[in-house]
């Protein structure tokens, strides 16, 4: 008989859902724009069995993939587990066999050496398939419409890297699926690789390189000619794992680096350029990056100190929720300079913001519009807890980098918002002309809605709201795919 622990990561809004099913034609308030024809896929961690350890991380849950199919002004819903090797063997056993988050030393002997991945962090459509991703394991292939799992892939044996980051980018010019993996040759190693997969799903090249130290390399930036990697000291070691401590811990004595890796075949580690930040800070996600002459601009929400209370300071310093608040910054480095120092660090917004997004047609290019989640602590909140991180993201924000204008929508006192996603109005619409879609979780009624807003007029509120008769667990990331990218029979 299953019984989940009475812990903060397994109760309340974070209580496991474990529901697979289909709902045809969701109830809608307002209107869903009829021209929206495609899919919004997103994923959340959702353990199918109680964890082996009561204090297990939220991020260790099995990947549950949600599909919202937009067509003819309607939205259909489907949800399935990503059937990883871990999921299958535990399903057969009827219990959890894999142990603590990213700690193989805590696994049951029967599964030692198996792939531990959960495919719970991001999902993207490419080459007619759905790539389900978790940064500590290979890419899991699923059908984008049925959500049936095909299995892990190493791209016909060509990809050497053992891991596959969840924050891949699709180059809007080439159509290549651009990604990387860290700890590429084994847990805690400093080996990484950057690689590109063509629009047909074939691996084009893989560039191997070394990073200054092993850390959580969760996201990266892509420009026309470079892949950009920030090294932030959310870093572990084997002593921590042997002691049963959380995999990652924040080390304020380590510097922050920004690595610039040229894109293309034949690149080696000696071609990589590293720049040092002026101080140690925290940064995880990336809004965008682009080139301007010899300079590279890298836009990321930056906090003055560790933003993850569940990965505590390794020196014992207490978590500081104010210093953990991220604000969008622009890091600039100059490839024309002989200095290893950043050329400039500049704050771009006044909002506490995270989960940044752009119009995907402008990834790696100079851009004007950005969106993200905002925590506004001055607004009324009728609930005590928010996301696993503790952040209570109650606004969707829009930033116009050309004018400095900021626009936002507040979701009300009972709700928090999951990561937004931009959808262009038409394939050839101007940058930013389109819609923002996002899940809104009402923490009082315990239901989730999918809202659609005008991307450049957020303050006007949702155009349409699809009402789910269930709550979806707090998710991580998701993406839109136009119907033209889906395996739909003519």
Curated annotation (Swiss-Prot):
Which residue ranges does UniProt annotate as crossing the membrane? none
Q: Which superkingdom, per the lineage?
A: Bacteria
Q: Does the keyword Oxidoreductase apply?
A: yes
The protein's annotated catalytic reaction(s) are: 1,2-bis(4-hydroxy-3-methoxyphenyl)ethylene + O2 = 2 vanillin
Q: Which residues bind Fe cation?
A: 167, 218, 285, 477
Q: Which GO terms describe its molecular function?
A: carotenoid dioxygenase activity; iron ion binding; lignostilbene alpha beta-dioxygenase activity
Cofactor info, note text: 1 Fe(2+) ion per subunit.
Question: Which Pfam family is one of those matched by this entry?
Answer: RPE65
Q: Which InterPro entries does the protein's record reference? A: Carotenoid_Oase (IPR004294)
Q: Which processes are annotated in GO (biological process)? A: carotene catabolic process; lignin catabolic process
Activity regulation note? Activity is high with beta-5 type stilbene and minimal with beta-1 type stilbene. A 4-hydroxyl group and trans-stilbene structure is essential for the binding of substrates to the enzyme.
The EC number(s) attached to this protein equal 1.13.11.43
Name the UniProt key words of this record, in alphabetical order. Answer: Dioxygenase, Iron, Lignin degradation, Metal-binding, Oxidoreductase
* Cofactor or coenzyme needed: Fe(2+)
Q: Which family does it belong to?
A: Belongs to the carotenoid oxygenase family.
Q: What does this protein do?
A: Catalyzes the cleavage of the interphenyl double bond (C alpha-C beta) of lignin-derived polyphenolic diaryl-propane type compounds (Stilbene).
Subunit and interaction comment = Homodimer of two beta subunits.
Name by which UniProt lists this protein: Lignostilbene-alpha,beta-dioxygenase isozyme III
Protein species of origin:
Sphingomonas paucimobilis (Pseudomonas paucimobilis)
């Amino acid at each position: 008989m299953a019984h989940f622990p009475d812990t903060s990561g397994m109760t309340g809004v974070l209580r496991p859902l474990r529901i697979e099913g289909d709902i045809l034609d969701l109830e809608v308030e307002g209107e869903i724009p009829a021209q929206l024809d495609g899919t919004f896929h997103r994923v959340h961690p959702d353990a199918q069995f109680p964890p082996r350890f009561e204090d297990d991380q939220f991020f260790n849950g099995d990947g549950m993939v949600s599909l919202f199919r937009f067509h003819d002004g309607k939205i259909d819903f489907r949800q399935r587990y990503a059937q990883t090797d871990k999921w299958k063997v535990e399903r057969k056993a009827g219990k959890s066999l894999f142990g603590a988050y990213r700690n193989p030393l805590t696994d049951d002997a029967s599964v030692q050496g198996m792939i531990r991945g959960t495919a719970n962090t991001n999902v993207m459509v490419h080459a007619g398939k759905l790539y389900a991703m978790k940064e500590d394991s290979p890419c899991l292939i699923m059908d984008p419409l049925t959500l049936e799992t095909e299995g892990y892939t190493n791209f016909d044996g060509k990809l050497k890297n053992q891991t596959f980051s969840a924050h891949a980018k699709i180059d809007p010019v080439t159509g290549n699926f651009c990604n990387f993996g860290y700890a590429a040759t084994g847990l805690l190693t400093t080996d990484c690789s950057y690689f590109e997969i063509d629009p047909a799903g074939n691996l084009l090249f893989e560039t191997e390189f070394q990073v200054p130290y092993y850390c959580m390399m969760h996201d990266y930036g892509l420009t026309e000619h470079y892949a950009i990697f920030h090294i932030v000291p959310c870093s572990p070691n084997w002593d921590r794992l042997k002691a049963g401590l959380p995999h990652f811990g924040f080390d304020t004595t380590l510097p922050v680096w920004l690595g610039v890796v040229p894109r293309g075949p034949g690149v080696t580690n000696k071609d990589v350029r590293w720049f040092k930040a002026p101080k140690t800070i925290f940064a995880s996600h990336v809004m965008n990056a682009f080139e301007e002459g010899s300079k590279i601009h890298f836009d990321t929400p930056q906090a003055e100190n560790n933003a993850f209370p569940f990965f505590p300071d390794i020196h014992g310093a207490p978590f500081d929720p104010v210093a953990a608040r991220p604000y969008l910054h622009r890091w600039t480095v100059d490839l024309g300079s002989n200095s290893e120092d950043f050329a400039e660090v500049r704050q771009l917004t006044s909002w506490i913001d995270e989960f940044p997004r752009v119009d995907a047609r402008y990834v790696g290019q100079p851009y004007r519009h950005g969106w993200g989640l905002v925590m506004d602590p001055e607004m009324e909140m009728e609930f005590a807890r928010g996301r696993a991180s503790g952040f209570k993201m109650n606004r969707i924000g829009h930033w116009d980098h050309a004018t400095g204008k900021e626009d936002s929508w507040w979701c009300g006192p009972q709700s928090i918002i999951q990561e937004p996603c931009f959808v262009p109005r038409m394939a050839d619409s101007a940058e930013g002309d389109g819609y923002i879609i996002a899940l809104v979780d009402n923490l009082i009624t315990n239901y989730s809605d999918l809202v659609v807003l005008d991307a450049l007029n957020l303050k006007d509120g949702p155009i349409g709201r699809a009402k789910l008769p269930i709550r979806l667990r707090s998710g991580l990331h998701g993406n839109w795919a136009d119907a033209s990218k889906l395996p739909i029979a003519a």
